[in-house]
Amino acid sequence: MKNILCYGDSNTWGYIPGGKGRYEYAVRWTGAAQRLLGDGYRIIEEGLNGRTTVFDSPFDGSVLNGKSHLMCCLMSHAPLDAVVIMLGTNDLMHSHTAWEASRGCITLSRMVMNGALHFNAHTPRLLLVSPIHIGHEIAETDQSPLSVSGYEESLKFA
């Protein structure tokens, strides 16, 4: 069995926009990946609403900082064959740029590639996924913590 850790934010968690709860597992992208890959693979979903790459929240401190929790996730789910990281959108909510978010992803990537050997027989493969583009209409709603300037910055992701 191949183990794949998916480390991300609300898009990995399955957040339904507008605060309407969580998508069923089969609807989330991790569930779709599990279905497509089949029984020889186990998708490990590590999504957290509001998670950033490496930045503390001015309101919640390090609770949502992806760097603070990645190593524990790598260790608790070992051995891993692959790690998928999809983070960066929430960095923009705290006035960081797409470039800074990409640097944060590089830091996380190095943690996977360098730290995994401590508890894995081999270094897992790494897939770094660009955050999804946020719709302009979402940035303009009162419920969105992403400003219009954050929306424009998000377009700089691949």
PLM feature segments, named:
Residues 15-17, 53-58, 98-102:
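N-terminal start-of-chain detector that recognizes signal peptides
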Residues 1-48, 54, 73:
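Serine-esterase "nucleophile elbow" of acetyl-processing enzymes
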Residues 47-50, 128-130:
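A general secondary-structure junction signal
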Residues 39, 64-158:
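Alpha-helical cap/lid subdomain in secreted, periplasmic
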Residues 51-70:
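Charged, often glycine-rich, active-site loop that binds/positions anionic groups
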Residues 16-25, 57-61, 141-146:
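Short, flexible/disordered intra-domain loops and linkers
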Residues 14, 52-55, 135-140:
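Short acidic/His/Gly/Ser-rich catalytic and metal-binding motifs that mark active-site loops
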